[in-house]
Design a protein with these regions (language model features):
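Acidic, glycine-rich active-site loops and adjacent beta-strand->loop/helix elements
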Residues: 12, 80-85, 111-114, 139-144, ...
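Flexible, glycine-rich active-site loops centered on histidine and acidic residues
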Residues: 128-162
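Condensing-enzyme catalytic core mediating Claisen C-C bond formation in acyl metabolism
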Residues: 1-48, 151-223, 227, 231, ...
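Catalytic phosphate/nucleotide-handling subdomain of diverse soluble enzymes
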Residues: 291-311, 320-326
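Active-site pocket-lining segment
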Residues: 225-230, 244, 248-267
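Buried hydrophobic positions in well-ordered alpha/beta secondary-structure cores of metabolic enzymes
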Residues: 6-8, 34, 63, 74-77, ...
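Phosphate/pyrophosphate-binding loops at sites that engage ATP/ADP/AMP, CoA/4′-phosphopantetheine
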Residues: 59-75, 231-248, 296-301
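Conserved catalytic cysteine-centered active-site region
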Residues: 35-37, 41-54, 81-135, 265-293
Length: 326
């Protein structure tokens, strides 16, 4: 059977670190308050001259190196992001140029924190259809650029970085077994950034109203995310006739430690089967899952033929899951 197999992973986070204590000097918060409610200790943020394509490029280089191929071997580049360098052209096109992968098609996916899984599912479809042999899938963000550091409810959450995988068209049982994707646009006003698009283009008024920063109803997002992700992971296991105890590692979107724990509890997974790095990076949106995947891979937390379950939830609302045999 033809499958899209992950043959390389890579990740990159900027050097600059913003700790909880740093944030406590900006807004009314504390290390204890943030850790208790989110599990986040620190996050990496972009430095001068760094943008989303900067991080995507570094993560891509590492993934290509592990895969043992060159950028010239790629048929397609897909980037999941909500923080592109600019509205157009896409981060994927900028990345294509940096990599000199001029033979590859390139485009972005905007699906909130689920962007990487949406991109992974699209790449899987292209490979299964026989239209691509090698695809680079990247999740990359510069959320610090759209974070309001006067808003204590959101500034504690977000960080920057990128993760990448190389998918290869191969025969066998290893690779992406299944993906499930969902969306509910009726909840778009619960997590959004109103400024900068065609509805509210940049102006003195939109800047004064702070429209160019993320807005979020944290409580409603949390409650919806827990239920949606619990249902999603159960459905993908049922679809593939797999039980929770067969999962070797759960890699959830690193948005909130309590959400990750709720999903693990639903699947009755012990701690050693749940990958967590939120304490180091915070919520990196589309970059979250591929960064965690790369770290788990390089820490030898995943072995050949292991079943890996990934899931994410984000603005839109969007959510989804992917089941992979390593």
């Amino acid at each position: 059977m033809v499958r899209a197999r992950i043959i390389g992973t890579g990740s990159y986070t900027p050097r600059k670190i913003l700790s909880n204590n740093d944030l406590a000097r900006l807004v009314d918060t504390s290390d204890e308050w943030i850790m208790t409610r989110t599990g986040i200790k620190e996050r990496h943020v972009a430095g001068d001259g760094e943008a989303t394509s900067t991080f995507a490029y570094q993560a891509a280089l590492k993934a290509l190196e592990m895969a043992g191929i060159t950028a010239g071997d790629l048929d397609m580049i897909i980037v999941g992001t909500v923080t592109p360098d600019m509205l157009t052209p896409s981060v994927a096109c900028l990345l294509q140029h940096k990599l000199k992968a001029y033979q590859a098609a390139a485009f972005d996916i905007s699906a909130g924190c689920t962007g990487f899984l949406y991109a992974l599912s699209i790449a899987d479809s292209f490979i299964r259809a026989g239209n691509c042999s090698k695809v680079l899938v990247v999740g990359a963000e510069s959320l610090s650029k759209i974070t309001d550091y006067t808003d204590r409810t959101t500034c504690i959450l977000f960080g920057d970085g990128a993760g990448a995988v190389v998918l290869s068209r191969e025969q066998g049982q290893q690779g992406i077994l299944s993906t499930l994707l969902y969306a509910d646009g009726s909840c778009s006003n619960l997590l959004y950034m109103p400024g900068g698009g065609s509805a509210h283009p940049a102006s003195l008024e939109t800047i004064a109203k702070r429209y160019h920063y993320l807005k979020m109803d944290g409580n409603k997002v949390f409650k919806t995310a827990v239920k949606a992700l619990e249902d999603c992971v159960v459905k993908i296991l049922e679809k593939n006739k797999i039980t929770g105890d067969q999962i070797a590692l759960l890699i959830s979107h690193q948005a909130n430690l309590r959400i990750i724990q709720a999903i693990a509890k639903r699947l009755e997974l012990p701690k050693e089967k749940v990958f967590v790095n939120i304490q180091k990076y915070g919520n990196t949106s589309s970059a979250s899952v591929p960064i965690a995947l790369d770290e788990a891979n390089r820490q030898n937390r995943i072995k050949k033929n292991d079943l890996l379950l990934m899931n994410a939830f984000g603005a839109g609302f969007t959510w989804g899951s992917a089941l992979v045999r390593w």
